[in-house]
Amino acid sequence: MQYYSLGKQSPNVNFKTAAITGQAPDKGLYFPAEIPQFTAAQIERFKTLDKASLAFEIMKPYVGGTIDDASLQQICAETIDFDFPLVPITQNILSLELFHGPTLAFKDVGARFMSRCLGYFSKQEKAASASSPIASPIASPITSSITSPISKATPQLTTKSTPQVTTKPTTVLVATSGDTGGAVANGFLGVEGVNVIILYPKGKVSPIQELQLTTCGQNITALEVDGSFDDCQAMVKEAFMDGELNQQYNLTSANSINVARWLPQQLYYFFAWQQWVKQYQDANGNYPAMNIVVPSGNFGNICAGMMAKASGLPLGHFVAACNANDVVTRYLATEKYEIHQAIATVSNAMDVGNPSNFVRIMEILQNNFTNLTHALTSYSISDATTKSTIARVYKTDNYTLDPHGAVAFAAAEIYLSQIKAEKNNRDIINADTSDTNNINNTATLNNPHSKAIILETAHPVKFPEVVEEAIGEKIAVPASVEFLLDKQKVSIPLAANYAAFKQWMLQ
């Protein structure tokens, strides 16, 4: 498998180079040259595979021989070594709980897969270095925001040099508002040949999130920045552009622009589908369309799901549930893609004014706006509705949503109610014969076949102020993170300016 840059000005690379460098030299995101296509027979076999075996089958084409099968099987098994239950909330809306990993957030999957891949590559390079007196040069990765999701060019090779890997230890720089840093810290903890530096805004993460960032030790360093998340992110971006730092460090990113973090997010869509089929398939092999509502900020999560569908997984319609940061919602309504400064909301992980992964969604859909409108619906949910949804669902359905899940739940209700009036619908899929790219998922709200799942991306305990105010009760701390409460945070205070950060890096 080769990967090309969506900037169209860099040479193709393999998975290893794409994972280590993060972005292409032309600042574009990497995209697989081919989307694997699973046959109907393979899809049928996927119904009964265990999670680890299924994960291996899905990820093997993307890795493309850069990791041997035995090692990839181990990486996949360790990546998904926790539950992904599909839990009913109402008759028509189910929750895919993605918070049963070590840091209680969906980002555990991508972070664990990426960390183990980089660890594998580090050992591989170390072994190669021991047998060769000449080390390879390194082309430093460069990061930049994506300014437009629309590109009609086809991938081409250029004469520019291909990024090379090196035996120099990899340094992962991460700016976080909470969940990303915790997942990356846990995923990379103890990984040989990889150091992680996390920048987080002082006083702007929850107590549990901060403990997840600051109590790891070993190869994880937490910098407590006296500023905002935007300050942290700006410093990380400037570091990737700094030639002096890149001479000393082999820098890479661990957010969803990196293919090793983005692509494994497909896995839990397959896991959800397995459970869906087991629960709803009838004797003739038919089952309701699994419409999917995803809380969306940077659009990496929903993009991974759309990749799964493009590879042949029979999924229903996708709904992007957004907060006040509604760039994509407005784009679908107006065909005008207008980025803006991020707006602060109670669903803060979705506070993104320029979603970098949307360009990948457009690539999946051949950069065609009509294709986009057929494949994706989007709604913008206010903070007031988010809070009232948490309260209402807790009271009526005895289910505790986090703010991001509440945005998704509210969007799911809107979607199901809007399709209620549509007629001549087709809401049953035959998994063996249906063209799932053209499913018209329209059914009445009270029809048991009209259903949707929401992705519950984080445990509500990570957002105690919003959730506890809404439900009027304290949230029980899960045993998996309760041990953190007895730990002492270890962080390095840092001023919110790049000069201070660079000085610390070079000392």
Model-derived regions, located:
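PLP-dependent amino-acid enzyme catalytic core
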Residues: M1-A130, V165-N430, N446-Q507
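Intrinsically disordered, low-complexity proline-rich tandem-repeat tracts
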Residues: P133, P137, P141, S145, ...
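Generic alpha-helical structural signal
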Residues: S145, A153, K423-S434
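Acidic/proline-rich low-complexity IDRs
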Residues: Q156, T444-N447
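Intrinsically disordered, low-complexity regions enriched in glycine and serine
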Residues: S434-T442
